Amino acid sequence: MKPKKIISNKAQISLELALLLGALVVAASIVGFYYLKSVTRGTSTAESISKNITLAAKNKALDNIYKVKRALNGQ
C-alpha cells in the first residue's frame, strides 16, 4: 500500500513560485524606497551646490567690475 500525498507537486511548485514572487516584490519595494530617498537627497544637494556656485560666480564678476573701475579711475 502506497502512502497518499498530502500536497501534490504542482501545488508545491505553485506555492514556491508565490513565495519567490512575494520576496521579489518586497525586495523591489525596499530598493525603490532607498532609490527615491537618494534621489530627493541628491536633489537638495545639487540645489545647494548650484546656489554656492552662482554666488561664487557673482562675487567674482563683481570683483572684476571693481578692478576695472579702479583701473579706469587710475587708482
Swiss-Prot record:
Keywords: Fimbrium, Secreted. The N-terminus is cleaved by the prepilin peptidase EppA, which recognizes the class III signal sequence. One of its GO terms (cellular component) is cell surface. Its main location: secreted. It comes from the Archaea. It is found in: Secreted; Cell surface; Fimbrium. The keyword Protein biosynthesis does not apply. Residues 1-11 form a propeptide. It holds the Pfam family Class_IIIsignal. This is Probable pilin MJ1469. The keyword RNA-binding does not apply. A motif (QXSXEXXXL) lies at residues 12-20. It comes from Methanocaldococcus jannaschii (strain ATCC 43067 / DSM 2661 / JAL-1 / JCM 10045 / NBRC 100440) (Methanococcus jannaschii). Contains an amino terminal motif QXSXEXXXL, which is part of a class III signal sequence.
